[in-house]
């Protein structure tokens, strides 16, 4: 079973995340930021991951630290749970519509961290969630997880729908990329390591 549990404590946050790549063993999200909880729940549900997130942060200052640090720990969990990545699909993509919005996420679990993010988020705040931090979260996940991520909103009007489609697309693309393929012999790289 490919799992990871990681706790990260700084002067600004304490984040504990448990991730199960192979079994949707339950989803429990508590960050203190309602919209962010909803997005992480959608990510795990549509990625079919078991995910527990307990995030305590300096929300009296700003939600940015909690959101970004949650991304860091989630990325670290993916990296740890994947181990040497033997037998995985590695590359995958997903398109997800939500009403008038369409998002795409493309991942390469390459061991090389990179983010291309293209989304026009016109509403600056959704509840206690600053929408500009969406990109920071995606960057934190990709860089801590050491994978390549291209995330974009192709079109849409409603900022909530755009962000939710992005989180769902990330979940679905990662679900497909981490899948074990019995036809893949060893590490899926000509280098022999990723």
Curated annotation (Swiss-Prot):
Top-rank EC class of the record's enzyme: lyase
Catalytic reaction list: D-erythro-1-(imidazol-4-yl)glycerol 3-phosphate = 3-(imidazol-4-yl)-2-oxopropyl phosphate + H2O
Gene Ontology terms: biological process: L-histidine biosynthetic process
Lineage top rank: taxon: Bacteria
A GO CC annotation given for this chain: cytoplasm
Family in the record: Belongs to the imidazoleglycerol-phosphate dehydratase family.
The protein's name: Imidazoleglycerol-phosphate dehydratase
